[in-house]
Amino acid sequence: MPDTARDRLADARVYLCTDARRRQGDLAEFLDAALAGGVDIVQLRDKGMEAAEELEHLQVFADACRRHGKLLAVNDRADVAHAVDSDVLHLGQGDLPVPAARAILGADVLIGRSTHAEAEAEAAAVQEGVDYFCTGPCWPTPTKPGRHAPGLDLVRHTAALGTDRPWFAIGGIDLGNLDEVLEAGARRVVVVRAITEADDPKAAAEEFAKRLRHA
């Protein structure tokens, strides 16, 4: 098994973003199922949550990731990432600049970027301090209402860059359209509803992991 966070990132195929499941009340059980099924990285994305509440939920994420040897990602906030000792900080285009985040977190925390256009993907593929990036949305998604979906053309462009830096396709990806994403050249994906809304999250994660690792 890969033994460092950077090794685990290189080996990662399935990146899950989920809310804190306050409505369902099953966060710990859900995370155990998804991580056991094959999710490699998990990120809490629950906009509007106060920092204290976010830290409380992230402790559940951190405990689950330790149990399963998987990576914990924090969205947007370097201070929160530092407080919970996360493995990963993910930054959008409008978030904290990468050098500032790196100054706060040091060299060991992995930093990812969101990209939504060819120029952004090209920059993220070479920018100093960036460890991985996400490219999309492949399809419109309710988790990002109003955001233009550049579609699979952006995935194809990113694949054509030939970068050794890990990158993930994102946006509306499910088991029904995964083959299209693979055909466009992606070998890693970010998943939300296809696992969070699955009747059997572990089985859904297993299927994603199997198909991505055999691609």
Curated annotation (Swiss-Prot):
<keyword id="KW-0479">Metal-binding</keyword>
<feature type="binding site">
    <location>
        <position position="114"/>
    </location>
    <ligand>
        <name>4-amino-2-methyl-5-(diphosphooxymethyl)pyrimidine</name>
    </ligand>
</feature>
<feature type="binding site">
    <location>
        <position position="76"/>
    </location>
    <ligand>
        <name>Mg(2+)</name>
    </ligand>
</feature>
<dbReference type="InterPro" id="IPR034291">
    <property type="entry name" value="TMP_synthase"/>
</dbReference>
<protein>
    <recommendedName>
        <fullName>Thiamine-phosphate synthase</fullName>
        <ecNumber>2.5.1.3</ecNumber>
    </recommendedName>
</protein>
<dbReference type="GO" id="GO:0005737">
    <property type="term" value="C:cytoplasm"/>
</dbReference>
<dbReference type="InterPro" id="IPR036206">
    <property type="entry name" value="ThiamineP_synth_sf"/>
</dbReference>
<comment type="pathway">
    <text>Cofactor biosynthesis; thiamine diphosphate biosynthesis; thiamine phosphate from 4-amino-2-methyl-5-diphosphomethylpyrimidine and 4-methyl-5-(2-phosphoethyl)-thiazole: step 1/1.</text>
</comment>
<feature type="binding site">
    <location>
        <position position="95"/>
    </location>
    <ligand>
        <name>Mg(2+)</name>
    </ligand>
</feature>
<feature type="binding site">
    <location>
        <position position="144"/>
    </location>
    <ligand>
        <name>4-amino-2-methyl-5-(diphosphooxymethyl)pyrimidine</name>
    </ligand>
</feature>
<feature type="binding site">
    <location>
        <position position="172"/>
    </location>
    <ligand>
        <name>2-[(2R,5Z)-2-carboxy-4-methylthiazol-5(2H)-ylidene]ethyl phosphate</name>
    </ligand>
</feature>
<keyword id="KW-0460">Magnesium</keyword>
<feature type="binding site">
    <location>
        <position position="75"/>
    </location>
    <ligand>
        <name>4-amino-2-methyl-5-(diphosphooxymethyl)pyrimidine</name>
    </ligand>
</feature>
<dbReference type="InterPro" id="IPR013785">
    <property type="entry name" value="Aldolase_TIM"/>
</dbReference>
<feature type="binding site">
    <location>
        <begin position="43"/>
        <end position="47"/>
    </location>
    <ligand>
        <name>4-amino-2-methyl-5-(diphosphooxymethyl)pyrimidine</name>
    </ligand>
</feature>
<feature type="binding site">
    <location>
        <begin position="141"/>
        <end position="143"/>
    </location>
    <ligand>
        <name>2-[(2R,5Z)-2-carboxy-4-methylthiazol-5(2H)-ylidene]ethyl phosphate</name>
    </ligand>
</feature>
<dbReference type="InterPro" id="IPR022998">
    <property type="entry name" value="ThiamineP_synth_TenI"/>
</dbReference>
<dbReference type="GO" id="GO:0004789">
    <property type="term" value="F:thiamine-phosphate diphosphorylase activity"/>
</dbReference>
<comment type="function">
    <text>Condenses 4-methyl-5-(beta-hydroxyethyl)thiazole monophosphate (THZ-P) and 2-methyl-4-amino-5-hydroxymethyl pyrimidine pyrophosphate (HMP-PP) to form thiamine monophosphate (TMP).</text>
</comment>
<dbReference type="GO" id="GO:0009228">
    <property type="term" value="P:thiamine biosynthetic process"/>
</dbReference>
<keyword id="KW-0784">Thiamine biosynthesis</keyword>
<comment type="similarity">
    <text>Belongs to the thiamine-phosphate synthase family.</text>
</comment>
<dbReference type="GO" id="GO:0009229">
    <property type="term" value="P:thiamine diphosphate biosynthetic process"/>
</dbReference>
<keyword id="KW-0808">Transferase</keyword>
<dbReference type="Pfam" id="PF02581">
    <property type="entry name" value="TMP-TENI"/>
</dbReference>
<dbReference type="GO" id="GO:0000287">
    <property type="term" value="F:magnesium ion binding"/>
</dbReference>
